[in-house]
């Protein structure tokens, strides 16, 4: 049996528990926004279901690297857009060719919008997380924070959940990213 990591309802529902737990641990705060990293879109879709159940007015955003922003482009065109898969990228955990069919339907239903961050912003987010939050994030796990930091004015004065997901980074990549980040 193969279970799709993002294009299966059971997986999406399971991934939605991450947002549910965060909201409950924070005593159900009134959120204005949530920014969630997206590869196939399952984590965003599941989280969106949980968030919108508790807080229907919350704006939900996918976070992706600029060169792999298939969700952002798909939301703008209101149809799934495929990316050129003949190239790599810093955020290798998010490099899916297009949004999953089921997650795209869920995310579109809830009015999710897309954000994208540059590799430079991702490196700066990794440095910020390491220096200020004592978290060692992989590039894919830092992209939501990168989107927040790259769009400070958009989110200024709001209560925004930023999903930091993933710390699976080799020391070479981590060191290179920290060196590239602006101090």
Locate the predicted segments by residue.
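PLP-dependent amino-acid enzyme catalytic core
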Residues: 1-183
